[in-house]
Amino acid sequence: MPAARDPIGVLDSGLGGLSVLKALREELPNEQFLYCADCAHTPWGDKPESFIVERTRAIVHFLLRKQAKAVVLACNTATAAAADILRKELSIPIIGIEPAVKPAAAQTRTGVIGVIATRRTTESARYLSLLRRFAGNVKVVTVAAPGLMECVERGDFNSETTRKLLLKYLTPIKDAGAD
């Protein structure tokens, strides 16, 4: 049985989940956290689903050996591929993150929203279910964004390469009238 002072594990395929960790620390200042990034195998977005499930499972078990009382999958791709599987296998809470379709659909003024994610996320049954549950009559322009995560992981936020990728991925969303 986990103790109150046991840490909450947080995992991502890379460093992007640090923003999730920051938010968790702000919301739960009395909690301890362990962060694990799989930088050796990042990005996961174009990897086979079986690879993503096994990497996620391995990291979760590592965090369990460190006494994690819960695990946050701070990665859309890991959530889409492995969250339901891990919830069936483990007795601790497995908390995933997903593209913010529900709040975006509720707040849109144009009736059009855009989602940029990894190919594995955009093709997942979990994401398609999310759209069915929360998009309603809102048009969702979904764009798989290969190469963008690699730029983020390198800290390459303002290079010509990153700007070209962003233009490529944001243009169909903008052209569709998304707000």
Give residue ranges: language-model regions.
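Non-catalytic structural scaffold of enzyme domains
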Residues: 1-179
